[in-house]
Amino acid sequence: MPAALVENSQVICEVWASNLEEEMRKIREIVLSYSYIAMDTEFPGVVVRPIGEFRSSIDYQYQLLRCNVDLLKIIQLGLTFTNEKGEYPSGINTWQFNFKFNLTEDMYSQDSIDLLANSGLQFQKHEEEGIDTLHFAELLMTSGVVLCDNVKWLSFHSGYDFGYMVKLLTDSRLPEEEHEFFHILNLFFPSIYDVKYLMKSCKNLKGGLQEVADQLDLQRIGRQHQAGSDSLLTGMAFFRMKELFFEDSIDDAKYCGRLYGLGTGVAQKQNEDVDCAQEKMSILAMINNMQQ
């Protein structure tokens, strides 16, 4: 049984504007030895539907994602760190980042906000003490968490999660075409394993994250629909599934870089791979200049 299933030493750290830089310094050290990162976001729902003609249902799903991510703001991000065996660092292993969000000024789905409020999110505190996304993006760029081939990202049905991450890191709207989105995604997050996509090869596993956790006999730490708790549970599910269904070895060619409900993701042209490498070098040079 992977150590990721041992609950007694797991700790979720709440991060607000006041302790952001201190916690990011810790993460820069942690990721050197614990480079498997389970991720989840909380966002204010779906508020618009795209109109027009679409090439396929997958194209429609991407356009639905794109128009909502462009309009809305991320509320929470959860990151849980383990090593390749599913073992946690001592002490804190999960960070829950709470971003600025204003119920008076920002757009949202009322049902989603009600769900998050009932799950314990403190929207008044988000408004007053939340993290500025631009400042967070600057710190994330230099954290060793993104743009690194050795870092493995674990997620669950994560098109929207990574949509918000790409928006946050680029400070711009998502690309109009899905293949352009995956090009940028693979630049920042070279290795992604979406647990919901992995479930396609896991007999009898079905449902959302909590249902899957129940089927795998996993115990949640923290509250459902909070990003830290959900990221922690996502990591647990990945390592349990890896052990039970994949004999502790997942075929990257089949699963890496694919997001459930969207296109193939990794089906990039070779010349795009060259462009991606050149873009990464440019970004790394920019980061190096920022650190000097």
UniProtKB/Swiss-Prot annotation:
Instruction: Please give the InterPro entries that the UniProt record associates with this protein.
Output: CNOT7/CNOT8/Pop2 (IPR039637), RNase_CAF1 (IPR006941), RNaseH-like_sf (IPR012337), RNaseH_sf (IPR036397)
Q: What is its EC number?
A: 3.1.13.4
* A Pfam match: CAF1
The protein's enzyme class: hydrolase
Please state the protein's primary subcellular location.
Answer: cytoplasm
Domain of life, source organism: Eukaryota
Q: Which residues bind a divalent metal cation 2?
A: D40, E42, D230
Repressor as a keyword?
A: yes
Q: Name one GO cellular component term.
A: CCR4-NOT complex
Alphabetized, the UniProt keywords read: Cytoplasm, Exonuclease, Hydrolase, Metal-binding, Nuclease, Nucleus, Repressor, RNA-binding, RNA-mediated gene silencing, Transcription, Transcription regulation, Translation regulation
- Residue positions annotated to bind a divalent metal cation 1 are D40, D161
Q: Where in the cell is it found?
A: Cytoplasm; Nucleus
The Gene Ontology biological process annotation of the record reads: miRNA-mediated gene silencing by mRNA destabilization; positive regulation of cell population proliferation; regulation of translation
Job of this protein: Has 3'-5' poly(A) exoribonuclease activity for synthetic poly(A) RNA substrate. Its function seems to be partially redundant with that of CNOT7. Catalytic component of the CCR4-NOT complex which is linked to various cellular processes including bulk mRNA degradation, miRNA-mediated repression, translational repression during translational initiation and general transcription regulation. During miRNA-mediated repression the complex also seems to act as translational repressor during translational initiation. Additional complex functions may be a consequence of its influence on mRNA expression.
To which protein family does this belong? Belongs to the CAF1 family.
Name of the protein in its database record: CCR4-NOT transcription complex subunit 8
Q: Which organism is it from?
A: Mus musculus (Mouse)
